[in-house]
Design a protein with these regions (language model features):
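C-terminal binding/interaction regions
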Residues: 8-11, 80-147
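Short Gly/Ser/Thr- and charged-rich N-terminal loops/segments
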Residues: 154-157
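Short glycine-/acidic-enriched loop or helix-start segments at secondary-structure transitions
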Residues: 16, 45-47, 69, 105-107, ...
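Glycine-rich oxoanion-binding loops at beta->alpha junctions
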Residues: 60-90
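Short hydrophobic/aromatic-enriched beta-strand-loop microsegments
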Residues: 53-62, 75-76, 117-120
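Short, ordered loop/turn segments at secondary-structure junctions
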Residues: 39-40, 62-65, 122-125
Length: 161
């Protein structure tokens, strides 16, 4: 199962919110797990899209709070922006939507870790693959992501690892 991180600003514009909602829905449709920073804006919209479609959402939150209401799993870190490393490290691929300096830090970490990064109206940086639509970004992320050795969901009838 592919784990895709969706990163972007907590104070998303209406266009970024709509884009993130579509990205989350498409991740769920493609049986991916959505990883994010667990807060509002882009993160909340992506989680809502995935959750509404029956997908699994994981929020790695910066404090001891509960994150947004569309999270299936909440990981409380108490690390502040340091949790950005965990968000990116947990993912097989990253989709950046808009964003400010927090998003920039996550992109830099992802590139340093050789994670594939796909951007929708985000920072113009070498290594970030520009995508025009949510469909394009999710399809590219799913294709680029290697199978995750960090996480496995057992299917009905499948033997434990």
């Amino acid at each position: 199962m592919t784990q895709i991180a969706v990163i972007g600003a907590a104070d998303a514009s209406p266009d970024e919110y709509t884009t993130a909602l579509a990205v989350g829905l498409l991740i769920a449709e493609n049986k991916g797990t959505l990883i994010c920073g667990g807060m509002g804006g882009v993160m909340e919209a992506a989680c809502k899209g995935a959750h509404d479609k029956g997908g699994v959402t994981v929020g790695i939150v910066p404090d001891n709070g509960n994150g947004n209401s569309h999270l299936d799993i909440v990981i409380r870190t108490g690390l502040g922006h340091g949790r950005n490393v965990l968000v990116v490290q947990s993912a097989d691929a990253v989709i950046a939507i808009g964003g400010g300096y927090g998003t920039l830090s996550e992109i830099a970490i992802a590139l340093k870790l050789n994670k594939p990064v796909f951007g929708l109206k985000t920072w113009d940086i070498d290594g970030v693959v520009k995508c025009e639509t949510p469909d394009d970004a999710v399809l590219r992320a799913a294709r680029a992501a290697p199978p995750s050795p960090l996480y496995h969901t057992r299917q009905a009838g499948e033997e434990p690892l």
